[in-house]
Each structure stands twice: as C-alpha cells, then as structure tokens.
C-alpha cells in the first residue's frame, strides 16, 4: 500500500513542481515505467533463488522512502530528477517479486487468487488514499509535501518490516518455505507469450489511467485537480472491489479456466470506455471510473494467477515478472509517450478510444488462452 502511495504521488505532484508540457512530462513517466518493468523482471529471477521475501520487501520500502524524499531536492535539476526517478523505479521493482514469492510459498493453488486479490486490494487502497488526501495536502502546504510525507511513511514501514523479518528468521521462520533452486534457462511457452501480449494491452490501459486520468479529466470536464483526483480515487475504489471479488470468484467458479473470466472482463472494459468517450458529466465519469477500475484490476489479479499456474515451479517469480515486464514496457511506450502525443494532437477524448482498442486486442489473447484451457479439460475428461 505504501509503495503505491509513493508511486501515485508522482503523476499528482510532479506536474506542479516542474513547468513543462504533456509530451515532456510523458518522457519522465516513460522512463519510470520502463525501468520499473526491467527491475521487476530482474528481481523476479533473483527472488526465485532467494528465501527472504520479507527482508527484501522491507529493503525495497526503505530505499523507496529515501528516494521519494529525495525528489524534493532534485526537481530543480531535470537531469538529477530523471536519475532519481529511475532509481526509484528500480527499487520499487523489487516489491512485487518479493510479494509473489511470499504468496506462492504460503498459499495453496485453490486459494491463491483470493490471496492475490487481497494483496492487490492493498495497493489500490494506497492509491485511493493518495488520490483523496494528497491534493488536500498540496493545497494546504505545497507539492513537495506530497513526496515528503509518502516517503517518510515508506521509510518507517521498511524499517519495521526488516526488523520483523529478522526476528522471524531468528525463530527459523524461513524453514517454512519450500524453495527450489532457480534455473537460469527460462522456458517460455506459447501460452506465456499470449499472456504477455494480453498483459501488454491491459497495462497500457492501467498505467494510462494512472498517469493521465487526473490531468485529462480536469481538462475534459473543466474541473479542478481535486475533483479529477477524486474521480480517479473512485476508479481505485472500483479496483479494490474488483481485486477482492475477482479473486474469490476465480477460486470458486473459474479455477479451471481463469482466462474465460479475463475475456469477459476485457469485454466489459471495452464497453465502459466506449460509453465514457461520449460522457461529458461528472456522474457518468464516476460510474465509468468505478467500472473500469473493477474490470482492469480484476484482470491484473487474473494475469498474475494465470502466470503462476502455467509457469514452471522453479521459475514462478521470473514468469510472473516477465508478464510485468511486458506490461511496463507497454506503459512506458504507449501509456506515457504515445498517449501524451495523441492527446496533444487529437484531444482528450482519444484516450478512451485508444483504451477500447487495447481492450479488444487483450480480449482476443485471453480468448485463445481460454480455448487452450478448454481443450485441456476435454482431454482430461
């Protein structure tokens, strides 16, 4: 939750600190997303051979806290700011592989989607709190306070987590984990490639909303930053519901074919953005925000669990992180740079049309995976 608090402060507070246009700002967002994705993949490979996810997660929070606070003193120099954001992205990339290792080694296959949903919901809670609280903090104090407070919370929580991990290790807690030695060679099947492609498209939407929703809604509806951030907060509220409900539904009814549920969700996302494209009032945008949040974060849970199920046992973290790598490469190129250019030249409404197209492509990929699951079930019968 606190890692997401730090990350969400970037698109809210950074535009207020540096005087630049959408396209130049998108380059900073792109670098952050790209290095976050690469770090996630590299650390995923490393975590397959490690047995201390709590310690690594605490270390991630400490480094994130220090670097987030560091933004307050580096924003005047764009080169130094870019370097700080790259380092921040790299340290945050350690967080999810550590969480994945913890969940895989402490959850059964019949309940992993529910656990994944709870963990994802905590991320959305952090984002929701950020979108509601940070604009008020910025209004009362200044933009630097957003980075200062979120960084300080991450730092304190990281210290607490490392101390907790140390005492658990001294009690032989780590012997609970069943660890297999990671192999350097990672076998990537056609199913994994289709999942990566689906994640690629889903993350264009997810990170496009993350980076651009507050700014574009402000311009499209002619409302204040506080109001547009609150609508984005409603999106994250829908995400919390989506992760929790999807995890439970997936474990109960779709455990043999989770890709089918993901296909239905992508169809829902496409229809939601088509409707939002024609919406010009706050009520419709709030409804669209909560529905899109429900569907897109539900898909995020499903992609992670599907990756766990189709990955070799000794490369689970690496394969889950590989899908994340594709997602954040997509976001760095399409959600940040391309979408920024499209909005500049075609207007704010192009975002919703762009997201609808991405939803359809992801729908096709999940449908192919679903058909493969159905063939496996028919052979088993």
Named regions from a protein language model:
Residues 145-163, 351-368:
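Symmetry-related core transmembrane helices of the 12-TM Major Facilitator Superfamily/SLC fold
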Residues 55-70, 259-274:
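Structural signature of the two symmetry-related core transmembrane helices
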Residues 39-52, 244-255, 343:
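Helix-to-loop junctions at the C-terminal end of transmembrane segments
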Residues 163-184, 377-380:
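Flexible cytoplasmic inter-helical loops of multi-pass small-molecule transporters
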Residues 10-12, 190-244, 300, 335-336:
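Extracytoplasmic gate region of multi-pass secondary transporters
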């Amino acid at each position: 939750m606190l890692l997401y608090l730090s990350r969400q402060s970037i698109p809210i507070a950074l535009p207020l600190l540096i005087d630049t246009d959408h396209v130049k700002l998108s380059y900073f967002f792109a670098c952050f997303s790209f290095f976050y994705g690469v770090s996630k993949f590299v650390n995923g490979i490393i975590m397959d051979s490690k047995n201390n996810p709590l310690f690594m997660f605490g270390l991630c929070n400490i480094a994130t806290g220090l670097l987030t606070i560091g933004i307050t003193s580096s924003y005047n120099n764009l080169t130094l700011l870019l370097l700080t954001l790259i380092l921040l992205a790299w340290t945050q990339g350690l967080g999810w592989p550590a969480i994945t290792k913890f969940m895989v080694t402490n959850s059964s296959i019949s309940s992993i989607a529910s656990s994944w949903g709870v963990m994802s919901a905590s991320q959305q809670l952090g984002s929701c709190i950020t979108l509601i609280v940070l604009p008020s903090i910025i209004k009362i104090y200044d933009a630097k306070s957003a980075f200062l407070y979120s960084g300080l919370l991450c730092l304190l929580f990281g210290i607490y987590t490392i101390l907790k991990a140390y005492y658990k290790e001294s009690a032989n807690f780590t012997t609970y984990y069943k660890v297999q030695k990671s192999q350097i060679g990672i076998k990537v099947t056609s199913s994994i490639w289709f999942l990566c492609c689906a994640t690629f498209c889903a993350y264009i939407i997810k990170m496009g909303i993350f980076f651009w929703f507050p700014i574009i809604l402000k311009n499209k509806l002619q409302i204040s930053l506080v109001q547009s951030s609150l609508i984005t907060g409603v999106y994250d509220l829908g995400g919390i519901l989506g992760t929790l409900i999807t995890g439970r539904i997936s474990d109960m009814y779709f455990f043999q074919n989770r890709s089918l549920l993901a296909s239905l969700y992508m169809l829902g996302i496409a229809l939601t953005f088509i409707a939002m494209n024609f919406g010009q009032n706050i009520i419709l945008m709030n409804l669209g925000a909560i529905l899109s949040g429900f569907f897109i974060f539900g898909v995020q849970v499903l992609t992670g669990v599907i990756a766990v199920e189709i990955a070799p046992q000794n490369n689970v973290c690496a394969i889950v992180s590989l899908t994340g790598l594709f997602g954040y490469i997509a976001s760095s190129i399409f959600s940040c740079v391309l979408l920024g250019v499209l909005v500049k030249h075609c207007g704010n409404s192009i975002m919703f049309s762009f997201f609808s197209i991405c939803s359809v492509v992801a729908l096709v990929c999940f449908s192919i995976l679903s058909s493969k699951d159905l063939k496996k079930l028919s052979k088993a019968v």
